[in-house]
């Protein structure tokens, strides 16, 4: 069918059960010690005031070696030390192992965080979100050594090969994207400015969507990069139709088609997340037993401790990562036809009314629209390779552009 395979590479961190980490924590003299960031504490406290994406503190104390290790995500996800050439060699060897077996490209997880400020100063740029801890964006994102790491990765793994590289770039902006995208670095980046338009000061805080900000953001990225990665959702984002509060039966299909047409006719490569082509919606979470995402669970526990459970549940239902991780809705059979066993996470209860089998028979369905839209992109030279020109609309609520 002409399919190609792009493989996800998570090389910012490993599991705390990985052999490297087990060896690293076995002794301060282990040859794997510097595969991770280990630092002594300040008395009984961690090395600095950094928070992580998922926990109040970005450091975890190890009772074996009496030091702290850095984890920018969950405490069971210790960060790899990209300063160590041996770590980079291990990563390049692994990537080449897959490329040599025919993988057509790589999607690199949180690529913007590979380089850290290894002086580990206290974070001050943001306000404290968790009991005095501060997220250290100024010390972990887009650090000076990052472009050099990506050039080295390109030279060791990708140069001279017909392979694509896409970086998931947390905190990327139109101002810094070109420091990691280019002929000798990455081909594309996933940027999240469109995803974050509905956020307040932090992810969980609601904020009304602004069509003017939407148009400004789209046009800025179309100008900033010659080629963009176009997407409405992934495994970390809520479902697109729910994000824009269009999940009612009357609006869902129309909204899903509108979002697809608005984004996937832009200049760039469309990336579709499973279920998007059906207009799948968020899950109506109401109990902790339904949650699997460590970020959502940590957020719920923190807010419960501060008597803000209602705020937490509103945030989880609207923005929690589990919304995108419910099983694909294939048909009306039990578990939406996804499995004859028990799925790891519950199936959205709306699957009898929203599934692939029904939409495949309906020429007016969201699925049918996606098929026509992608066929149009394939057949139209203007949509495949043409330029982007924003058009002035007679009213603010209209987003219009021209491809030629």
Residue ranges, per PLM feature:
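Active-site and adjacent substrate-binding regions of carbohydrate-active enzymes
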Residues: 1-404
């Amino acid at each position: 069918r002409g399919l190609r395979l792009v493989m996800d590479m998570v090389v910012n961190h490993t599991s705390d059960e990985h052999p490297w980490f087990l060896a690293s924590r076995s002794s301060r003299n282990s040859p794997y010690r510097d595969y991770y960031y280990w630092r002594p504490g300040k008395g009984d406290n961690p090395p600095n005031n950094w928070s992580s994406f998922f926990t109040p503190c970005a450091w975890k104390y190890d009772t074996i070696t009496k030091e702290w290790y850095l984890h920018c995500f969950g405490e069971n996800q210790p960060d790899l030390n990209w300063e160590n050439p041996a770590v980079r060699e291990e990563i390049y060897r692994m990537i080449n192992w897959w490329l040599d077996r025919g993988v057509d490209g790589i999607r690199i997880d949180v690529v913007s965080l590979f380089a850290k400020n290894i002086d580990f100063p206290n974070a001050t740029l943001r306000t404290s979100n968790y009991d005095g801890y501060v997220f250290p964006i100024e010390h972990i994102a887009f650090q000076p050594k990052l472009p050099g790491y990506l050039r080295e990765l390109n030279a060791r793994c990708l140069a001279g090969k017909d392979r694509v590289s896409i970086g998931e770039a947390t905190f990327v902006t139109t101002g810094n994207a070109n420091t990691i995208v280019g002929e000798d670095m990455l081909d594309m980046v996933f940027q999240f400015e469109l995803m974050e338009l509905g956020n307040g000061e932090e992810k969980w805080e609601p904020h009304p969507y602004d069509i003017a900000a939407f148009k400004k953001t789209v046009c800025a990225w179309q100008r900033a990069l010659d080629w963009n990665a176009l997407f409405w959702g992934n495994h970390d984002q809520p479902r697109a139709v729910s994000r824009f509060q269009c999940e009612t039966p009357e609006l869902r299909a129309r909204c899903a088609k509108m979002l697809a047409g608005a984004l996937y006719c832009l200049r760039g490569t469309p990336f579709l997340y499973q279920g998007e082509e059906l207009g799948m919606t968020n899950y109506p979470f109401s109990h902790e037993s339904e949650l699997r995402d460590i970020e959502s669970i940590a957020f719920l526990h923190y807010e419960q401790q501060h008597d803000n459970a209602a705020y937490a549940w509103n945030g989880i239902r609207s923005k929690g990562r589990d919304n995108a991780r419910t099983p694909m809705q294939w048909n009306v059979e039990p578990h939406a036809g996804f499995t004859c066993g028990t799925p790891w996470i519950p199936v959205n209860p709306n699957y009898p009314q929203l599934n692939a089998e029904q939409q495949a028979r309906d020429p007016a369905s969201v699925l049918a629209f996606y098929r026509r839209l992608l066929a149009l992109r394939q057949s139209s030279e203007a949509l495949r390779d043409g330029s982007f020109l924003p058009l002035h609309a007679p009213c603010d609520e209209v987003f219009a552009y021209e491809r030629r």
